[in-house]
Amino acid sequence: MTYTKWVKLYKGTKIDYDNAYGVQCVDLIKHYIKKVLGATPQSIGNAYQYWEKRNSKYISNLFVPVKNNKYTIPKTGDVFVRSSGYNSKGERTGHIGVCTGNGNTEYFYAYEQNSGGTGEGMTLHRHTNWSSINFLRPKYQYITAKSGLHGYSKRKGNKHNILIPYASKIQIIETECYRKEVNHKTYTFDRCMYKGKKYYI
């Protein structure tokens, strides 16, 4: 299932994926992993632990970590992980959600549930405080741009080497590994694998 279809079908829905502890933010992520990424969700703990366990076999098979910095702009389908946050019992929980791709270096939007312990279903929220937030980018993705996506074999190349067609499957192998300034605007590139070759996209 595509990210877009997932949002359309489940926006506003209260998802209790594991039928335990009611509607939790991590339930939405398990649902996302199952429906969109096509993987079997595992229980790894509270929300903040998705980042702390980013190098575990389970997480690293699904995601590539994106450590937040001043150039970071979350992409569609990225999972944000907030390390801060506690429940009513004083237990550290953190928070987690799925980014829309709308935003810049100052704010971003994401779908999440049980924000602030309210028990709400899948709802869109705007985030401006990034102090304890990092991201997990899905390792395997499909090109969503109808016109395709330009791939560059070299960091300093000004001319693209390939046009990766719409709906093609790529593997992200490194995130935010290269930055390029064009007309006073900084663009950040990931490195991917496509048909056995590596490209900056």
State what each model feature region is.
Residues 118-129, 197-201:
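A short macromolecule-binding patch
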